[in-house]
C-alpha cells in the first residue's frame, strides 16, 4: 500500500505530483503540507480531430527558461531549472510577433500540457488556442496521450480546452510537504 511504499521511500523528496485526495492522510502522516496546488485533470480522446493552428509556432529553446519563469504566474511552484529541463525533455511551442516571444506552452514532468501563457498585450487574439493546438499535434505525433491540469477557478483555460473537446477526469494536487 501507499503507506508502506512511502516508508521505504523515506521522503527523499518533499514534492509530490498527481496526488488524489485519498492519498493526503498517508502523505501527511509525518509531515505537514507547506503548499498544495489543486487542479482538475482533463483528457483529449484520440478520436477527437484537432485542426492545425492557423498561426505558425516553433519550439522553444532552453535559453528561454528565464524569460518564461519571469512571466509565469506560478513562480512559487516552479523554477528556472525545472522549466529548462521541461524544454529539453518534451514538446513546446512559442509564438513570436515582431521578434518578441508573446506566447508559449510546454509540458510538466507528468507530461501534461501546461505553462500556457500569452503576454497581456496580446491576449484575446486566439494565440492560446493556436499554441494548444500546436502542442496537441506534437504530442500526438509522438504517440503520447494528451491531458492538462487546470486550476478550477481558471475558467478561461477550462473554456478553451472544452472547446477543443477535452473531457474532465479527476481532481489532483501538487503538494510540497514541510
Name each model feature, range by range.
Residues 21-33, 152-170:
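Conserved active-site alpha-helix within GNAT-family acetyltransferase domains
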Residues 9-20, 139-151:
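Conserved GNAT acetyl-CoA-binding A-motif
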Residues 1-5, 124-140, 155-159, 163:
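Conserved acetyl-CoA-binding loop-helix of GNAT-fold acetyltransferases
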Residues 1-54, 175-176:
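Acyl-donor-binding surface of acyltransferase catalytic domains
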Residues 104, 129, 169-174:
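Residue-level detector of high-confidence beta-strand sites
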Amino acid at each position: 500500500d501507499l503507506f508502506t511504499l512511502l516508508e521505504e521511500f523515506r521522503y527523499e523528496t518533499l514534492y509530490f505530483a498527481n496526488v488524489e485526495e485519498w492519498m493526503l492522510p498517508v502523505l501527511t502522516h509525518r509531515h505537514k503540507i507547506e503548499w498544495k496546488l489543486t487542479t482538475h485533470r482533463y483528457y483529449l480522446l484520440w478520436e477527437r480531430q484537432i485542426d492545425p493552428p492557423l498561426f505558425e509556432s516553433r519550439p522553444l529553446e532552453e535559453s528561454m527558461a528565464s524569460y518564461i519563469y519571469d512571466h509565469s504566474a506560478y513562480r512559487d511552484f516552479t523554477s528556472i531549472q525545472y522549466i529548462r529541463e521541461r524544454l529539453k525533455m518534451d514538446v513546446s511551442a512559442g509564438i513570436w510577433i515582431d521578434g518578441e516571444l508573446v506566447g508559449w506552452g510546454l509540458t510538466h514532468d507528468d507530461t501534461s500540457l501546461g505553462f500556457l501563457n500569452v503576454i497581456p498585450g496580446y491576449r484575446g487574439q486566439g494565440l492560446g488556442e493556436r499554441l494548444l493546438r500546436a502542442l496537441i499535434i506534437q504530442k500526438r505525433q509522438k504517440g503520447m496521450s494528451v491531458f492538462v491540469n487546470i486550476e478550477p477557478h481558471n475558467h478561461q483555460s477550462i473554456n478553451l480546452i472544452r472547446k477543443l473537446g477535452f473531457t474532465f477526469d479527476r481532481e489532483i494536487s501538487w503538494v510540497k510537504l514541510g
